[in-house]
Each structure stands twice: as C-alpha cells, then as structure tokens.
Amino acid sequence: SYTGRLNYAGRSGSASDSMEAEEQTPGGVGIQVQGEWTHHFSPKWSTTVNAAFATKYFPDITADVAVRHYLKNDWEIGAHVGYGRVAAYTKRYEWNDEFFAGGTGDNGYLFTGWNESKTNLLTVGGELAKTIEVVRLNTKIDMHFFNSNFYYNAQIGAKYFPANDGKTNINAMASIGSAPETAVLDYALPGSFSHTNTMVGLGGQYMVSPNITIGLMGTWNTYYNQTNTVRGSSPLNPIESISTRYKNLYNIYAQVYISF
C-alpha cells in the first residue's frame, strides 16, 4: 500500500528573520511532505520504506527503512534504519563600537543572529509491540550516530482504538534519552547529546474515509540546550564561552494521511 502524509507545525517567535538571542529560527509554520510504501511479504513479515522533505521545524530530509515480524499472541518485533539531515545553530557576534562605548566598557560584542549548518544523523533502532484487544502497547529504542559517537533515545507508547476501522485512535507516548526525540533535533543541536532529554505527547487520529485520516498531536519536550557567547573589550581579543540550560518546547502537529 502507498500512503502520503502532510504534517503541519506552528511555532511562536519573531515574525521576521531578526531573531532574539534565544530564538534559533523565526516563528511561523512548517510543512513536511512524506511518502510511504508498505508491503506484506507474508502474514508474518512486512517492510516499510518512507522518505520526507520539509520546509522548516522538521529535518530537511528524512528516509527510513523498517522490517516487522508478527509473532504469536499478537506480539510484534521490528527493526529500522534511518537517515536525517538536521540543522545545527551557533550564535553570531560582531564588534560594535557604539555598543562598547554605551556600555560598561567591558564588552563590545553584539549578538547579530544565528549561523546555521547542516548535520547528517544516522539512526538504528528496534521495537517491541503487543496488541491487547483494542489497545496497542509498544516500546522502542533508537541509537543515533552523530559526530563519531552513539547516543540513545527510548520511547514507550499506547494506542486505544475506539472504533472498528483500525485507524481511529487516541495515543499517548513518552521518551527519555541521551539524545532528544527526533522531532526536535533541529532545536536541540548542538550540545543536547549526552545529556538527559525527555518528551511526553498526547494525540489522536480519526478516519474520515477509507482513504483519508486526519490527526492532531501535542508534545512537550524538555531538552538540554548549549549555546556560545562572545564577550571582550577589544575587537582583536574575543573571549568565547558556553552557556547551558534546559529548555521546554511545546509542539502541536496537524496531520493528514492519504492512502491508496
């Protein structure tokens, strides 16, 4: 079967590209377009291949291949490998004579914006799931390969299917790991890896017709954020330091699924 997904994300923030020191990207909306192909080789084996492209608030490019094996008593195991092209941000500072003269005389470097670079992220993961009547429980762990190091993110989830269509559901999830949940990697990089990051989410999906399903998902991410700061009393001698703190990020995702 083939499935097309359209994901929409809205974020608060500046209405222009002139961001404040705590905003890595301006506010607005982002769109992700995803295509997916699923094939059942037998009653016990299936594979799924998907790829996605996005404007902002999502990784630029993602691709994933998954294999699933169906066991007795409604148990499932799966494995997947994926690739994502995500953004990393560093603060940009420039020397400003007027700022230096109007201050206390110990700093003349003024924040002027964010430098953005792209980072390749490889992911390998496994999943275990169990269906109990109208409830599906699952747990999965992802290993992320980034900057020659491995990091992890573990997630648990539950879906309740109140209808008999197999698609309408209410779902909840939570995750913890040394890497943040994949959906916020653009906001978390750099510096978020090797520290504890958490996420909780709640949402649902409704089947409008046999070919169209709509969904709404809200998530709350708490992630470790690391940024650079430049100070100095001379344009020839900048002093760079690192500031760290935990940040909260709230997302609301609107989703449209079209299958055929």
Regions found by a protein language model. Name each.
Residues 9-14, 22-32, 52-63, 85-90, ...:
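Solvent-exposed loop/turn segments connecting transmembrane beta-strands
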Residues 96-186:
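Detector for outer-membrane/organellar transmembrane beta-barrel domains
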Residues 2, 40-49, 73-79, 132-139, ...:
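Repeated loop/turn-to-beta-strand initiation elements of outer-membrane beta-barrel proteins
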Residues 159, 167-223, 228-235:
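Outer membrane beta-barrel transmembrane domains
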Residues 32-34, 62-66, 76, 123-125, ...:
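Membrane-embedded beta-strand positions in outer-membrane beta-barrel channels/transporters
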Residues 206, 245-260:
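Outer-membrane beta-barrel "beta-signal"
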Residues 39, 69, 128-132, 160-162, ...:
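Residue-level signature of outer-membrane beta-barrel architecture
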Residues 2-10, 49-53, 63-65, 79-85, ...:
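Transmembrane beta-barrel strands of outer-membrane/channel proteins
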